[in-house]
Amino acid sequence: MRSKRTRVNNQIRVPEVRLIDEKGEQVGVVRTDRALTMAEEAGLDLVEISPTAKPPVCRIMNFGKYQFEQSKRKAAQKKKQRLVHLKEVKFRPGTDVGDYQVKLRKIATFLDRGDKVKVSLRFRGREMQHRELGLELLGRVKRDLGNIVVEQEPRLEGRQMTMVVMKAKGEGNKTKREDHAEIKD
């Protein structure tokens, strides 16, 4: 497998290259040794920009500066990426008020971090006859959180009812204090 390293100066071993000078203007197809001489006269490097082109495209530039700009560009792209995790918070139909508040705050924390949250509700035994309690609880979670988008509506999977939520984009972001103050009410 060929390495992706950029070839510079004497590493370029093709007879002819399409040359772009330091001002960004096309010089045309020239012999590689002539292009190297022009780069040395300018006090810069001959850098192979597009090795797959016929003939390869080379540019006269400061290679150190080029590498620095490439690394900055990669860092900026990496910074823009955000890995979204799916967190799960489990409830029961008989979840008491105190536990409900704690779990709701945990969901709010996950959403503030930008994660998606799977809210699951587990039914045991005869609780399956009262699925409406589960829908009511998930509806209450949705209401209490306020600034969210339901990605997956509540649905029953065996003995478990699940709903996936995420933070709404573009709406007024509240501070954590305001969120928690609303949850306590």
Curated annotation (Swiss-Prot):
Protein localization: Cytoplasm
Principal place of residence: cytoplasm
Gene Ontology molecular function: ribosome binding; translation initiation factor activity
PROSITE patterns per UniProt: IF3 (PS00938)
GO cellular component terms attached to this protein's record: cytosol
Signal sequence, start to end: none
Alphabetical UniProt keywords: Cytoplasm, Initiation factor, Protein biosynthesis
Function: IF-3 binds to the 30S ribosomal subunit and shifts the equilibrium between 70S ribosomes and their 50S and 30S subunits in favor of the free subunits, thus enhancing the availability of 30S subunits on which protein synthesis initiation begins.
Quaternary structure (record): Monomer.
Protein name, entry field: Translation initiation factor IF-3
Gene: infC
